[in-house]
Amino acid sequence: MKKINKDIGSFSEDLAKKYLEKNDYSILDCNFKNFLGEIDIICKKNTLLIIVEVKSRYNNNYGLPRESVNFSKQRSIIKVANSYINYKRLPNINVRFDVIEVYLNLESTNFKINHIKDAFRLN
């Protein structure tokens, strides 16, 4: 089951990247990892650095995708984002945290993307 979930996650991230590129976002990094955690997609639009968490579901048994980006997950993403900003030497850059929900249909190739901009903030 873990392999299937990993495959679904990778597929969903690919769909999210294509969606972002189609909507004029420049992809800077994907699956950025360090000892603090991982960020799915890091992109830029105009002067804004956007940190994207991708969540997918093929049913609602476990709730909406965005519901899994709880407070603890948000804190983890923020820590990794701060470390990325320091690593890339991007001081004083404006940052936005987005969630992209990917709804998959296992019986067809249909899918739906819901892009939640500014899903959470640095506090």
UniProtKB/Swiss-Prot annotation:
Transmembrane segments: none annotated. This is UPF0102 protein Cbei_1183. GO terms for molecular function: nucleic acid binding. Pfam families: UPF0102. Belongs to the UPF0102 family.
